[in-house]
Amino acid sequence: MKKKLGLGSGVAICVGLIVATSCLVSLGTGMGSIGRWFIIPLFAVMVLNWFIGISFAELNGLMPRVQGGTGQYLLAGMGPLPSLIGNLSAYVITEILSMTAEITLCGLVLKGLFLPHVDNRIISIIIMALFLVINLFGVDIFSKVQNIVVFLLIGSMVLIGLIGVCKLGISSNVVDYAANAPTFEQIGGFKGLCSYAALAFWLFIGVEFIIPVAKDLKNPRRDVLLSMTIGLVLLFFVQSILGIGMTNYVSLDILANDPAGTPHMTYATNLLGNAGRIWMG
């Protein structure tokens, strides 16, 4: 079979599974809880995930025909029981917690913006069915769709983040971050920063999902690790820019405890009014 996926598609796979509404909620919560200090655990977790990426790339090089990721690697190295536990913890539980939250939030946002009379559960099911159909057409069609979606998502997040960082939005809604910024002691020092590493981890989880499609890459020896590295660095900078922008237009207490549970939507509304709300939605 002809290998069809290049480096760009590999990066899109790494990033596309992470850049999502649930991650924006986690970003807003982290920034609201400890302010811009949240960028420090964000960076530390990015480095940790890079080491994880190196491990997966090495395992893929040793066993290039293995397609099952964590479960198959554990099966070869430690036996069936660790493999079962690894599959449950790395994929099943993670997908249940993250993807259900993501598809639910997507349905809620679309209902609030465009379809107020439609049940959000119906919207979520339709979106899930749409992606199921796209996947049934094969990895080539899936990669083309994902490349376009990821490019638009990243570009949109960078732009709306830069508008916030440069304070180019609605001037009356600008928040004086410096006046309310927590000090290092107020966030609990180094221990406090470490406690937010778990929250920051959700902003990078899933970059290793490129492993199951490594067989379809044109140059897997080069592109597996390079895709994960570029994806992690790209995510760190995009999320840092967007997080700083959030703190310029939304107070920290609202970011941390947004009444609607969507701090990114509050930020977009404060930044550009209803146009920002539609844009972020």
Question: What name fits each language-model region?
Answer:
Residues M1-W37, F43, N49-A57, R65-Q67:
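Membrane-interface "cap" regions at the ends of multi-pass membrane proteins
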Residues G107, N120-Y177, F201, I205, ...:
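Membrane-interface loop-to-helix entry segments
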